[in-house]
Amino acid sequence: MGILSWIIFGLIAGILAKWIMPGKDGGGFFMTILLGIVGAVVGGWISTLFGFGKVDGFNFGSFVVAVIGAIVVLFIYRKIKS
């Protein structure tokens, strides 16, 4: 899946990650989007790295990977910030 697809997934994944893990994070909506994009890209890369198959296209599996990646990045961001 191209980087543009991961950015779009990241936008949505960031919003969902924030919804799943509510809390006060600096940066507001912009930070949520940025963490979602980073999480989606990292999630896709890790999924491929660990042999879960190539994540490509707009499908449910890719979306789940993007959301999980965004949640992990949000968790790490909060741990570093606190």
Swiss-Prot record:
Subcellular location: Cell inner membrane
GO CC, one annotated term: plasma membrane
Pfam families hit by this protein: Transgly_assoc
Topology in membrane: Multi-pass membrane protein
InterPro entries, sorted: Transgly_assoc
Keyword set includes Cell inner membrane: yes
Keyword Ion transport included in the entry's annotation: no
The protein's name in its UniProt record: UPF0410 protein YeaQ
Organism: Escherichia coli (strain K12)
Gene that encodes it: yeaQ
